[in-house]
Amino acid sequence: MGQKIHPLGFRLGITQDHRSHWFAKPAQYRQLLQEDNSIRNFLRTKLINAGIARIDIQRKADQVEIEVRTARPGLIVGRSGKGVENLLRDLQEQFKNKRRFRITITYIPEPDLESTLIAEFIAQRLEARAPFRRAMRQAIQRATRAGVEGIKIQVAGRLNGAEIARSEWVREGRVPLQTLRANIDYSYCQAKTIYGILGIKVWMFKGEKFSSKAVTT
């Protein structure tokens, strides 16, 4: 049963950090959590080609600080910062409240080490009608060249237009899902093809964050 747990939630507080940083009263918690989800969906829709790997949100009083980690910051910033200004204006119009938004753009120097971007690459290839095995092999080659220690990819659905849906997976290197000190990056996305939706899961092993020796006090 251990491998069925979400690999990021399993490691929260150990090798993974929360993606929303704030405290709220119990009565407001649900509303703010839904607002965080809406902000992320809005930004990913607006910046669909910007190579967004992660969106972190912090709240301080009436201010919402959004950090966007992207492989293509130029597409977001635009000329003279006009892109960020337009994003802030759109956010204020979309979420008509008294909160003030602030956006920080963080550049990712090696996008092939991000499971989110690898999954999106596979989805784009599948939507372009590339054979799923070739798309998986190309993704593994990109991640391996970037220096990842292990990667596992699973694609499920009507593969290559087959009548019966199935799942196929491939792995390169080590992906120790049961080791808590293992730095596992996980992502899931969907590819919308003419035959239906294909689900794509990517696990990446980036090494161990702690020494393998037990620490005793």
Curated annotation (Swiss-Prot):
Ranges of residues in domain KH type-2: 39-109
Presence of the UniProt keyword Ribonucleoprotein in the record: yes
GO annotation, biological process: translation
Organism of derivation: Chlorokybus atmophyticus (Soil alga)
Subcellular localization: Plastid, Chloroplast
Cystines in this chain: none
GO CC annotations on file: chloroplast; cytosolic small ribosomal subunit
Gene behind this protein: rps3
The protein's name: Small ribosomal subunit protein uS3c
Sequence similarity: Belongs to the universal ribosomal protein uS3 family.
Matches recorded under InterPro entries: KH_dom-like_a/b, KH_dom_type_2, KH_sf_prok-type, Ribosomal_S3_C_sf, Ribosomal_uS3_bac-typ, Ribosomal_uS3_C, Ribosomal_uS3_CS
Domain of life of the organism encoding this protein: Eukaryota
GO molecular-function terms, A-Z: rRNA binding; structural constituent of ribosome
Keyword Ion transport: no
Quaternary structure, from the entry: Part of the 30S ribosomal subunit.
Coiled-coil blocks: none
